[in-house]
Every structure is written in structure tokens, then in C-alpha cells.
Amino acid sequence: MAAVREPREEAAVGEGEGEEEGRWGGLLPELVEEVVRRVEASGGERWPARKDLVSCACVCRRWREAAAAVVRPLPESGRITFPSSLKQPGPKDFPIQCFVKRNKKKSMFYLYLGLLNGTMDKGKFLMAARRFRRGPHTEYVISLDADDLSQGSNAYVGKLRSDFWGTNFKIYDNQPPYDDAKTSSTRSSQRFGSTHRFGSRRICPQISAGNFNVGQISYKYNLLKSRGPRRMFCTMECPSTQETWENSLKTKSLRCTGTTVLRNKAPRWHEHLQCWCLNFHGRVTVASVKNFQLVATADPSHPDSVGDEETVILQFGKVDSNIFTMDYRQPLSAFQAFAICLSSFGTKLACE
């Protein structure tokens, strides 16, 4: 009798959950939007209070649609709310301040959203990466789950792959940067299909997953002196800022905004300190060859493109033995910025 009774109990629980969700989903759309709007207004601009908005979006489809309508995308609001924010470009007028924690023994790197100023800030966990050695190459697998860094996982968001010398890198996204983008022919990309299971943690489950090349990073030979600053160049396929993430999900299409070319900002030599210096505005406190600032430069393949030598798009620097700050802004996303910063770890032969 017990074997017959258990399925009935499970069925009863499932029916109860469906009935409960039906009651929440049956509320007027205007009422649901007003509730979500008040939750955001009641101190939900920063984490951890902002998790209440995520809870609202998890109730059912109607509440999720209301949250998408009320909560503005990262480029407009300047706030990271949902996992989709990690693939959206940062705000234009100010940087998103994050920090990276390194665990050398486990070859792990953790990205956090900075909530407070100071190295004692616990932060809001965003992504994690782990370094793997695969033959002559080194790979950094990036995931939304620090405990699951498999490329076959729904938490997988992309990876960074280096050459043998550790001077040239390619960034792979698990989702296409634009329509008709071609996936790489690596073995790991063949494990992904177009299907997804309910409850997927992927940033955009509606779009087929794979490994799409969205950026390249190269470290050039150091012509100044030993232990001098690294010379760094990045070519990135950046996400569109002209349409909201919600619209891209509805149309299942993504736009290509062209290529962004970045290079490291040239430091100045400080005679008194006898070292190369950059102005990090107090965000970097420990001298390190890993410290850098990236600015936009003109694209050689487009004669009409214009660079901006003053606005720092991404800066990365050391504040403790295993803690680094990471500040990024438009046109980079958090995922792209994190991947670029990961490339600074490890020895660069003939570059330093």
C-alpha cells in the first residue's frame, strides 16, 4: 500500500503548487507591476536588499514579465540585478565597481560586486573561474556556480583560452554575440544542444549554447626595460546598447555593434619612486605588473573610427595579496571584463 500511496502524495503536492502559482499569476498585471515597483523603491537599489526583486521575478511568468518591465537594463539603471546583467554592457557615465578574489591552491578566481569601499567587503558573488591546463593551452572556465565549473553545465557562461606562451588569448561566449555567429569547432562546443531543461541557470536559455569567439587579447613584447609595464591590446565584439535585453529574448535575435579595440593606457615614470605609475583614483594600492587600465583606440580596419584616450573602460589592480579590484563600463560587459582580467594572471614570457 505504501508503494501505491507515495505517488498520490507527490501528485497532490504538485497540484497544490500549481494551484498556488495560479493564484499569484491570476493577479491583475497592473497590480503586479505596482508591487514590483514598490519593492524596488523600498531600498532595493543595492544588494543584499535587491534580492527581493529577484524573488518577485521567480514567482511565475506574469511576475517575471512585470519585473522585466520595471527593472531597467544595466546600461540604463547602472545596477546589476539578474544574471542577464552580466552579459549586458556597463553604464556609460560611471564604472561598475567589482573585485576579484584569487585562490592559488585551487586555481580559482571569484568575481564579486563591490557593495562597500574597502577590502573587508564581502560583496555579491557574480561569477567564478578555474584555470585548467589542456595540453599546450591554458583555459579559464567561467561559471555562475563556483561549485560547478563543467563546460556541460547550465551554469557555464564562457571561457578564456591562451596559447602556449601565455601572450595571446581568445574569449569564448556560450551564446552568440549576434545573429548568424559561428561557433568554434572545439570538442567542448559540440556537447551543447539547442534544448534546455526547466530551471536552467543559463543567462539566456532561449538561445542555443555553444562556444562563440567574442574577443582576442594579446600581450606585446616589452621594449622599455625588464619588469616594465605590459603592452596589452584587446579586440572585442561588444553587446548592443540600442535594444533592451527583454526585446532580444522576445525576438530571439541579437545585434552586432561592431568591434571595439582597447589598449593599455601608457603609464608615466615616477623619478622619486623609481617606478611606472597610473592614477587609479585610490582603487589600487599595491604595485604589481598585473595592474592596468584600458582605453578605446581607433580601429585600424575602420578609418572613420575615433579613440578616447581619457575615458578608462576597464581598470584592474592589486589591493592585497589575493584581492584585486575590477572597474568596468560601457561597452564591456562584466563577463568580458572578467575574462580580460583573468588573462593578466600567469607569467607572460618575453613580455615582462
Swiss-Prot record:
<dbReference type="InterPro" id="IPR025659">
    <property type="entry name" value="Tubby-like_C"/>
</dbReference>
<feature type="domain" description="F-box">
    <location>
        <begin position="22"/>
        <end position="78"/>
    </location>
</feature>
<protein>
    <recommendedName>
        <fullName>Tubby-like F-box protein 10</fullName>
    </recommendedName>
</protein>
<comment type="similarity">
    <text>Belongs to the TUB family.</text>
</comment>
<dbReference type="InterPro" id="IPR018066">
    <property type="entry name" value="Tubby_C_CS"/>
</dbReference>
<dbReference type="Pfam" id="PF01167">
    <property type="entry name" value="Tub"/>
</dbReference>
<dbReference type="InterPro" id="IPR036047">
    <property type="entry name" value="F-box-like_dom_sf"/>
</dbReference>
<dbReference type="InterPro" id="IPR000007">
    <property type="entry name" value="Tubby_C"/>
</dbReference>
<feature type="region of interest" description="Disordered">
    <location>
        <begin position="1"/>
        <end position="23"/>
    </location>
</feature>
<feature type="compositionally biased region" description="Basic and acidic residues">
    <location>
        <begin position="1"/>
        <end position="11"/>
    </location>
</feature>
